[in-house]
Amino acid sequence: MVILMIKIGFVSTIDSDDLVFEEAYKEIKKYGIEFKILDYKCSRKEFEEFLEFIKEANIVFTKLMGGKNAFKYYDELAEFCKRHNIPFLPLPTISEIHPDLEKDRTVDDDVKNKVVKYLGYEGVYNYKNLLLYLANRFGNLNVEYEEPRPMPWQGIYYKGKYFETLDDYLNYLKELGRDLDKPIIGVLFYRNWFVANNIDYVNDLIDIIENKGAIPIAVFSSHLKNELGSIGTLETFKRFFYKDGKPIVHALINTTMFTLSMGVKAELLKDEPEFLKELNVPILQGIISTGFIEDWKKSVSGLNPIDLIIGMAMPEFDGAIIHFPIGGKEKIKDGEVGVPIIKYRAIRDRAEKIVDLALRYANLKLKSNKDKKIAIIFHNYPPRNDKIASAFGLDSPESVVNILKEMKKRGFIVDEIPKNGTELIKKMLNYATNDKRFLTEEMIKKAVGKVKKEDYEKWFNSLSEKVKQELIKNWGAIPGDVMNFDGELIIPGIINGNVFISVQPPRGFGENPSAIYHSPDLPPTHYYIAFYKWIKDVFKADAIMHIGKHGNLEWLPGKCVGLSNECYPDICMELPNIYPFIVNNPGEGTQAKRRSYATIISHLIPPMTISDLYGDLVELEKSIDDYYETENKEKKEFLKKEILKKIKELKLDEDLLDGKVIDEEINDENFEKLLNKIHDYLETLKNRQINDGLHIMGVPLEGDKLVNMLFMIIRYQFNYLEILAEILDYSWEELNENKGKYHKILDEINEIGLNLLKEYMQYNFDENKIDELKTVKINSKLRDVLKTVSTIYKNLMKVDEEIINAVNALEGFYIPPRVAGAPTKDINCLPTGRNFYSCNPQEIPTKSAYEMGKKLAEDLINKYLKEEGKYPEYIGVIVWGSPTMRTKGDDIGEILYLLGVKPVWNKMGRVVGLEVIPLEELGRPRIDVTLRISGLFRDTFPNVVELIDEAIKMVANLDEPDEMNYVKKHYREEVEEKIKKGIDEKTAKETSLYRIFSDKPGCYGAGVSHLIDEKNWESIEDFAKVYVEWGGYAYGKGYYGVEAKEEFINRLSKIELTVKNEDSQEWDIFEGDDFNSYHGGLIASVTYYSGKKPVSYVGDTSNPNDIRTKHLKEEGKEIFRTKIMNPKWIEGMKRHGYKGAADFSKYVDHMFAWDATSGIIDDWMYEKIAEKYVFDKDMEEFFKENNPYALLNITERLLEAIERGMWKADEEMKEKLRKKYLEIEGMIEEKL
């Protein structure tokens, strides 16, 4: 027998095929066939070895999911085959169409069609005959082969058996004596793994489900319908998860990747996946990692970037509850086909845990509501009595009252419904709380729970040795000192029927303040662990509900994503986690989803309105109007003096950062300039978006609040005001260029806009009544906007679904998904009450985001150039995850454009590369940018981190003059300097390009807020040292979390300009501590390490048609005037009793913090705070009645500002504040 040498090459993205081809090749290699597979993730060396192999190949074919872009060497491969006359058949996976592959095909249609069938049907039989067919067709082999044969496309798998119908399977289980009345858990896995017999992990899941007393239905399928026999997701669900037209499963563990909806027609999906709503069971995402289990175990990041996208981000589009890897790859052997042979194996403890959780979700569906126990957890940061129920934009106590009402209505045992949210908190304050200053013996005595040492010891002993050692090292012997009274750990909160309402334990930095300086990865306390174990094992909760943005559980140390049993969020979270969360914060909501397995229930933002002017600001505007309108010279001169006097009294000249107005320096010309600036500024202050109180879950807006909210949503997003101006024959561009001059016209347009909406409201926003509206002439553009208003209104009226779905989740229902976003920028996030998702990281930045980023960069550079007379060489930028998700990458676009680089997108809108913008096109130097990214951004956008790092390296290595490329200039200087110091060239080059810094892997935050909250600082040196300790880790392509504190200090010492952008006015920089902790911390660090305070900007894109780059201090003054001192804002907050007072306290905390780091609060501002919030009689009564702890904290903060020299108050003020503090403290203690 003559042995022929036939060579066949194959490039694949589907590694489960490798095992099948290995088995197939064993049977046919005797015919002299050489067959090699090249994995799409191959190295350059491996690719070149493959080219050497295929030089004399008879044919090369591919199976590339995603087309040519999936394989980085594709073009080289196609060119190589063409050059060497090798028949080339590039194919995607079945059901994909990629014309870019088709154009490179050099074999006939009949060959392609047959190969597609062999590859589509899969299995050893088909792959063996595929290779024989190709060897016969292209290698002159004369051996019989079989035609492609269909293999099962979908079905039920059970312990080596395959069932075509649900009835066949259930009948088989009955024959085995199984009790079908038990909970039924669905498992979904890929058909190709079934055909490849690569299902060890599925066998394990089946065993675990049965061992825990439930019935498994393990279904294999392909997401996409095809002509070869796949019926697709929708029909698969109907065939195997329904019986007699009703769902038979109680929970579903999905182990497939991407999105279940990808194979379902758009009309069946509508806005939300209707087929999943009909199934109506929780979908638990059990991730089967594309990486090796051993790598995951060792990894601090957890999952690899591919798993993050296809195993987490995309399933979130389905409303899946994201969990952890329950399986991954294990290498079986080195294959004869050129690649290692792998199998997917279970990670046993993770598989056990996901089944436990699936059973707990099934239990929510099966158990009677009257028998369920629910824990409701308020956040409490800082852990003080004025800040119980801290949640952004939400009246969380009132919302919980509404949740309790709905629970009682549905049969949950709730003994009493509090009169309102304030009464609920007052009741909680009668029991133990986290604020140890006010814990009395009586409170400790009547605590709802006490954990003895021996009880905690059982929980403690269930932890791994590593975790036990960490806890003991940081918190001492069990059960620790935190919340330990007479040897027992006290559980705060109240029990109301079958509902436990409590406060989340503190993170731990208050209990160990020195750890802020050296241990950002400080583990939670023994008490923290005990609290969550007590809820599960003693209170025996069926589910937990965390209320509002955001707690600390999801930020505890551990792997970044894809947690193990040694990660602290995983240790604590063993129950279904329902999490109402503000709709405009996708990033931190995503953190809760991925690190505490939360089902998000999105809630609306607070009611929004325009700020308006008040008090002396109104009078000043009138005086300016009078000045412009009068012809009388004497009156003009009088008004001029009055205007100057009022400007100085109100300190408005300081707001504009032009220095104080000095009468002697004022002449007619500069007075007119000043007047124009002040007039424009008043218009800005008048029209800033502010919240009118807080949102209450489930409560629809009505009347003026509804009209104002609709107005704020449409005014910029749909160019509402511009359309009205056009109808009224005004030039919108001219009006905006001279806002002060034309403010009366702008006011008129605003008023008409509001009146039109009020009139429309009389018709319940019925779009069929648009032509009956009389307020203004309706043109086609306005008609379209009003039709959109009708849709927005309907979605706002679905706000009751926030409460409905929160309680639905407690009944084990499916919560449908919807994209997160800021409603005033993107109405697609409405309605709320949804399990929101964020974005596809591969699309960041989108084309529109890059264009917005360009505008931001140009505005920033132009402002700096105008003010400083030069280009900034070094810029420090703060980059967060949530803004990136909301804007789809504005900040990333800005950074790339500062560097002089633009992304390359493929046809699907995914970023696939970078392109340098030539200097002649750029028209300016390339700016050197240092990023401080949040831990959340690091975790959610690893691909973007690598993209920016790649851009930096590209720019640093360009052949351009130093004066036109600051990155290259600084890189060259640093490398030379390091080599002189004896550092080797490789290290010098690598470290001199570190530009992206973040937290230590598995850690989060900037540390500065903890220092301020614990009063654990003396000067900006402390902030700088903590900022570097927490953020001194470098990230980029090829390195992850490298400790680089000296490099970070080096960058900080050279930064001239800092910036953090804000894309909406639904929040502001005084609303949360992270704004200051990151940006303020950066400013303090630059000031300390450089010896000079940097210029600091805020890029405001809240109105995308009018981007404004402002000085940080300007932004602070705007917020101070439009919110903190604005009666309209104050009265709105006061309506919310305890929570409104808590938020007043929060704002003063954060103003103080900004002043500590960045010096942006002037003495007069502190004085105004004292006058309004401490000494105003009405406010004092409000605080005393609703939340005296808030008044105590505000007074304490003001005294601290004086003591630290931040506020140069006189002795009289100091004494008044001291007296007030002692008075309030005495009042509180008297009531305890």
From Swiss-Prot:
GO terms for biological process: chlorophyll biosynthetic process; cobalamin biosynthetic process. Pfam families: CobN-Mg_chel (PF02514). GO terms for molecular function: cobaltochelatase activity; magnesium chelatase activity. InterPro entries: BchH, Cobalto_CobN, CobN/Mg_chltase, Glycoside_hydrolase_SF. Belongs to the Mg-chelatase subunit H family. This is Uncharacterized protein MJ0908. It comes from Methanocaldococcus jannaschii (strain ATCC 43067 / DSM 2661 / JAL-1 / JCM 10045 / NBRC 100440). The lineage of its organism: Archaea, Methanobacteriati, Methanobacteriota, Methanomada group, Methanococci.
